[in-house]
Swiss-Prot record:
This is Putative pterin-4-alpha-carbinolamine dehydratase. Its EC number is 4.2.1.96. Belongs to the pterin-4-alpha-carbinolamine dehydratase family. One of its GO terms (molecular function) is 4-alpha-hydroxytetrahydrobiopterin dehydratase activity. It holds the Pfam family Pterin_4a. The lineage of its organism: Bacteria, Pseudomonadati, Pseudomonadota, Betaproteobacteria, Burkholderiales.
């Protein structure tokens, strides 16, 4: 079982994720992304879904047209873990190569 990040671990890890923010009332992080169009957003979600399946760690997300809202938390640990940080870093890398909204 994975362990929940301590306050110090959380602070250190989140320094690498400036586009993510804390979810009020939860031990979770979130990010909203905008893409050029629906196809770009769906392609992003597909790449993340493949990685999430490999990790057996799945995001909470919501998609409308070119917007994707992502929330990460580890349910087994009831909070933020290293797995969330790893997936957030992957999401940032994929988003960096996508066509942004104009």
């Amino acid at each position: 079982m994975v362990h929940k990040l301590t306050s110090e671990e959380r602070k250190t890890r989140l320094e690498r994720l400036p586009q993510w923010s804390a979810v009020p009332g939860r031990d979770a992080i979130q990010r909203s992304l905008r893409f050029a169009d629906f196809n770009e957003a769906f392609g992003f979600m597909t790449r993340v879904a493949i990685k999430a399946q490999e990790m057996n760690h799945h995001p909470e997300w919501f998609n409308v047209y070119n917007r994707v809202d992502v929330t990460l938390s580890t349910h087994d640990a009831d909070g933020l873990t290293e797995r969330d940080i790893e997936l957030a870093l992957f999401i940032d890398a994929v988003a960096a190569h996508a066509r942004p909204a104009s």
